[in-house]
Regions:
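Predominantly soluble domains enriched in secretory-pathway, periplasmic, or organellar proteins
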Residues: 3-331
Length: 331
């Protein structure tokens, strides 16, 4: 049998390189790229299975051409297992593993969320959001409900994965893009065009707090230590919030220069910002990883101090990332 050994120094950062149709596996022991693997066009997001073994990548498409596939990657063996064809379901973006065998994926062109059986490589459920640009997805802790952030409608959709039904759509603010479920079960939504963050009760979906968050708040990630992280693309910042009090603990201002805007998704819209978008945390909740789409770099941030402890490099226009506690084999 295969012995999977995990220690504090062995882990992998899986990075989707949007402009390169590839994924980089960064060995966090030494910070180097262990492997670069080909995906479909426009790999925008990636999520790792609970055991850390497999990464699932959404191939969103590029150049105005919507993709309709997922790439399954074996993290330990550093190889592509297979490509899953989504058929009529196009522009897959947000992705979360529901359990060992299934994953939930937003499909923007269809205004829906699909649940995919990974082994069979087929869609087993499709739930309509009836909203514009269903972009990111988060699951509640027991995996029974999914929340999609719908940029074009400024809302989230609450979807019951057990029944396959939409529970409701909740308007949060213009440009609702990032979504995360905190350790307290609250649903945090970043409204990029409104420059706000909305915190919703996870049972009633009433607004607990609306937080002013200027600078294009674009992604959210929850930590196991009771914090919620928000990246602000225009401001070039990472904000750390207290999940319980909703107060700001600190803002990390990144001093990283843009490499230039040509050919990049947001172009020169944010001036000299490095355009921090993707943000994830390690399993301890002590470190965050932030992808800077206009600087082709990932910052590792110590959340206790707010210090950037190292710079990691993957491919061109990194954005979606996932963390695995397993490390890739070296040949």
């Amino acid at each position: 049998g295969l012995l999977l050994v995990s220690n504090a120094w062995s882990a992998t950062l899986v990075v989707a390189n949007k402009a390169e149709a590839s994924v980089s596996l960064i060995d966090l022991d030494d910070g180097r790229v262990a492997a670069t693997l080909a995906t479909g066009d426009g790999p925008h997001e990636v999520d790792v299975s609970a055991d850390g073994r497999f990464a699932l990548v959404t191939n969103y498409g590029s150049g105005g051409q919507s993709g309709n596939s997922l790439t399954l990657i074996d993290v330990v063996n550093a190889g592509v297992v297979k490509t899953i064809d989504l058929g009529e379901y196009k522009a897959p973006h947000g992705v979360e593993w529901v359990d060992d065998g299934r994953a939930a994926v937003t499909v923007e062109d269809n205004q829906a969320l699909v649940v995919v059986d990974i082994e069979k490589g087929e869609i087993v459920q499709a739930i309509g959001t009836d909203q514009q640009v269903s972009h990111m997805v988060a699951l509640d802790p027991d995996g029974r409900r999914a929340y999609t952030a719908n940029i074009g409608s400024g809302s989230i959709s609450v979807l019951n994965l057990a029944s396959g039904e939409r529970v409701r759509n909740v308007v949060t603010g213009n440009g609702a893009e990032g979504v995360a479920v905190s350790s307290l079960g609250h649903v945090w939504v970043t409204n990029r065009a409104a420059d706000t963050v909305t915190v919703l009760d996870g049972e009633t979906y009433t607004t607990l707090k609306e937080i002013a968050s200027p600078g294009f708040p674009i992604r959210a990630a929850a930590t196991p230590k009771g914090q919620v992280l928000v990246t602000r693309a225009r401001a070039g910042e990472l904000v750390v919030y207290d999940a319980g009090t909703f107060s700001e603990i600190r803002t990390v201002a990144f001093d990283i220069d843009s490499l230039g805007a040509e050919g990049r998704l947001f172009g020169d819209r944010f001036g000299d910002s490095s355009v921090p978008i993707g943000v994830i945390v390690d399993e301890t909740g002590e470190h965050a990883y932030v992808a800077h789409a206009n600087a082709d770099v990932i910052t590792e941030v110590d959340l206790s101090s707010g210090d950037v402890v190292r710079l990691l490099r993957a491919g061109r226009e990194p954005d979606g990332m996932a963390y695995s506690a397993l490390s890739p084999r070296r040949d």
